[in-house]
Amino acid sequence: MEFDDHYRQAQRATYDCLLFDLDDTLYPLSSGIATECRKNIGDYMHEKLGIEESKIPELCDILYKNYGTTMAGLRAIGYNFDYDDYHSFVHGRLPYNKLKPDPVLRQLLLSLPIRKVVFTNGDEVHAAKVLKKLGLEDCFEGVICFETLNPPSSSCGTQTSSKIFDIVDHFSEPDTNGIELPKTPVLCKPSVEAMEHALRLANIDPQRTVFFDDSARNIRSGKRIGLHTVLVGTSHRVKGADHALESIHNIREALPELWEKAEKSGSIRHSGKVAMETSVTA
């Protein structure tokens, strides 16, 4: 009996969930969506928050580096705004027509009888539009998005100080050691707290999950919480990445064991399409 139990445990798949970032992961950076998004963020900061245009590039870089997203950083340093208005302005004007259906990726995803979940810092509407444009809207069990981690009742109405913290000036000082940066009410990657919370909400076991993301910071955080990590968009493997793929189409090349187990069980779905061969570092 004990032998049978051990045998059954050995037959269990190594992974039972695939967790995917959305932007610049399920579609390539070359689409230009990220560039347009950065422009819209800058326009929002100038038009809606009254920030001088000349100060926006440096401010964006500092906020992104220290808070994960510019939005999270803006809230931290004292700007109060409606999250829906921000997302509508930043994402609502994106050229989604640049995204095209990806039948190769669709077949790769559908060929595996395993949980597949999207985890994005973006809002729900944006995620739905992207997945629909890619033809992947029915390939995932669910989407963990901005609203999942930041429900309106928890932080949208949180008031911040009327005084704006000058974070640019803070980092221009020769010695900022010991001076703590203001905290943000926004939960988002690469915060370990946010990522752990997301996994709890989705009932995902990090030890049995493969995490795909184009951000090296997110990959490092994913590794810290026990995820098996795959950096997407480059073949250069960075610290914290178990694998590195130039293209998401190379999932099978990086993790052949997923398909091998499915093929042995007879549950894999075959297609006449062949995935592109690009570089992978493991």
Language-model segments: residues:
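Short, surface-exposed alpha-helical recognition segments that flank or form part
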Residues: G32, Y96-K100, V118, P182-P190
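Conserved G/P- and acidic residue-centered "switch" motifs that form tight phosphate/ATP-binding loops
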Residues: T25, T120, D214
